[in-house]
């Protein structure tokens, strides 16, 4: 791991090998950190909502701020019709955020640095939003691909572009998160090794750069969770509030 910056992304088995036919379903480090992230979320918000005192403690304050933040994001992006989906958006944001943050711990594993994880999340969102769109609007949901005010001569081309854009949503959503997390952690590993090499000559400048880069990566971890959640809200808004 010290010499290969890509080694940190390796998935390895924890415990005995378990197979279902030809499919390996063994418990891995990826499964471990997804479970740890989920348990951490449950514990924090369970303790944060247990007392519900007038003067909140730090955990309760964190829970209340998180609730208000996501609630406002949904209202501003998808409107009041999206309120029934608050629990899903909230859980999605927190899961991605905690997976990103746990990946910042040395010798841990960044779940969201693997395209299969981010693509499954994005595909689930894409399928769910599409189903909601047809349930709410029937075949009128297809109006999403027919922008108003487009000249008839350009309409076939615009419809094709809109359909391709719609079908590429899970790809763009998953690749954005995966690429940013993998690139950020790779850069941190490479730069960290560079700082260790410079340690023989001393100096605070390389260490300061490492601290600054770590702070930047923490910010990126939050922003990527936010972008993932807000794009989900935008897609949900298209399904609930057709404006074409």
Feature locations, PLM:
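Selective transmembrane helix interface/packing segments
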Residues: 1-244
